Amino acid sequence: MQRAVLHCIVKGPAHTRIDKTARMREPMTDNDSGTFPSQPYWETKKLAEMSREEWEALCDGCGKCCLHKLQDEDDDFVYYTSVACRLLDCETCQCKDYPNRTVHVPDCVQLSRENVDTLNWMPSTCAYRLLSEGKGLPDWHPLVTGNRESTFMAGMSVRGMVISEDDAHPDLTRYIVKWPA
């Protein structure tokens, strides 16, 4: 039996988890007549049309994008590991230095409107990925629930389930997980 060769492909972008949910869910008039939009912005706007604040609020704080991933050379399958970027606070799922993350972790991928469609390794539950694929947000998403803890409460966060790369064995295959990705 031949063993698959896996390579670390990405550590992923680390997003700050600023609680803007309440403000994002407040009704805002969308025209001079003072009428209120009938649908939330993520259901009416394309990713490219969103403001920076709206874009950042899409992050559900799961931390999965900040995990080391391995890609099989033979079939390109991406495996998630339980090893997090050294900047991810494993208990809060927040980046320890979001504004300067690419200085500390040069291969940290910055998710953007330009590259969101090309990053097929993003978690299947990621709001950016879901919206780029024309899908809606899951019921547990903080923008839907109005509660930043809903990702964790739904079991969709890596909070408390991962270790820092600083504490991991160099053989990342030891840490491959089968969580929902």
Give each language-model segment a name.
Residues 2-3, 27:
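Cationic, low-complexity basic patches in intrinsically disordered or flexible, solvent-exposed regions
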Residues 3-5, 13:
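N-terminal leader/targeting segments
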Residues 25, 29-61, 70-181:
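Short loop/turn segments that flank or connect secondary-structure elements
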